[in-house]
């Protein structure tokens, strides 16, 4: 640049990113010369920049704000396959950590230190171990990668135009230490069904701007044959002051059966309730959802007691979840197709 050598490399290893920082003066035209040979794929040269006043503008914005909305997370440039990045926590598109990039952690810490209320909006395509944010942010909204009208949806949710009712479709672990090695195909400790620890957020977790109360759990039958379906019914009441949806979740446990999951989602139903309203809700549980895969890999229905939990999330966790428990008896046995 301007006849000054900025950097060079004779390596064909495109998995490594090389950076060089320069200060550019306003009003000066710079000549740029790039010479390269591309023997493989994924090579890239690009110029990125930030304005010197951005840090000052950021401090002024924090000072003037009543509430801070921090939009943080990941991006397509970080999440993917065989990507030429070498950033801490990432390796060629794979992740070596579930934490946020450290620069974003530092940003969030500085925002909270301002003393202003901080709301975190997450943009990501996979789980994040946002342990510090969980303890220090006033609220956290998981937006994923929401698309063209995502900003409108996020703004309306934060403004209280509607009550969020999404539920996590995967487990948010606290760290990679809670995740079994990828070269171990044993199901022990893997996914919400076999995990014995306490994650950051459980599969099926989600909060609302109101609260719900469950009562009077019943089943359409108390003894279930090997070919029978099952249905669970209960009353759900909105005991808060805002109309909202509740996602009623049904989890099953097969106590004493080797290889059976500790818990398994068997059915769910989303219902809308006005403040003070009570609805009788029925959740259908198809016959196949009463089965489990045993240690030999066979999917079967086994005779014995089947424990059932119905509520707004999983039956265990540090966050108390409203719900009910019951049991039915399975009287027959069957081996089902895989």
Predicted feature residues:
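C-terminal non-catalytic regions of proteins with extracellular/luminal or membrane-system context
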Residues: 1-338
């Amino acid at each position: 640049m301007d006849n000054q050598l900025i950097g060079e490399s004779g390596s064909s290893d495109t998995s490594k990113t090389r950076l060089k920082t320069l200060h550019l003066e306003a009003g000066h035209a710079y000549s740029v010369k790039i010479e390269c040979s591309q023997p493989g794929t994924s090579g890239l040269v690009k110029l990125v920049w930030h304005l010197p006043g951005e840090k000052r503008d950021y401090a002024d914005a924090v000072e003037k704000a009543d509430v801070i909305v921090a939009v943080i997370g990941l991006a397509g440039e970080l999440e993917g396959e065989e990507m030429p990045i070498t950033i801490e926590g990432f390796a060629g598109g794979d992740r070596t950590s579930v934490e946020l990039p450290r620069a974003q952690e530092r940003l969030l810490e500085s925002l909270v230190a301002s003393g202003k209320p901080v709301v975190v909006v997450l943009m990501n395509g996979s789980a994040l171990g946002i342990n510090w944010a969980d303890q220090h942010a006033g609220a956290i909204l998981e937006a994923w990668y929401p698309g063209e009208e995502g900003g409108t949806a996020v703004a309306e949710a934060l403004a209280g135009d509607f009550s969020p009712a999404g539920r996590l479709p995967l487990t948010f672990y606290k760290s990679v230490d809670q995740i079994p090695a990828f070269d171990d195909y044993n199901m022990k400790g893997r996914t919400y069904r076999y995990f014995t620890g306490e994650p950051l957020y459980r599969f099926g977790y989600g909060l609302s701007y109101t609260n719900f109360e469950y009562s009077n759990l019943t089943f359409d039958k108390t003894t279930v044959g090997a070919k029978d379906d099952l249905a669970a019914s209960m009353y759900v009441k909105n005991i808060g002051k805002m109309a909202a949806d509740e996602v009623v979740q049904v989890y099953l446990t097969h106590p004493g059966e080797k290889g059976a999951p500790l818990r398994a989602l068997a059915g769910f139903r989303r219902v809308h309730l006005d403040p003070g309203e009570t609805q009788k809700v029925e959740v259908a549980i198809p016959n196949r959802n009463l089965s489990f895969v045993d240690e030999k890999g066979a999917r079967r229905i086994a005779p014995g007691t089947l424990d059932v939990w119905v509520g707004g999330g999983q039956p265990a966790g540090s966050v108390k979840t409203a719900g009910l428990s019951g049991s039915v008896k399975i009287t027959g046995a069957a081996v089902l197709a895989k």
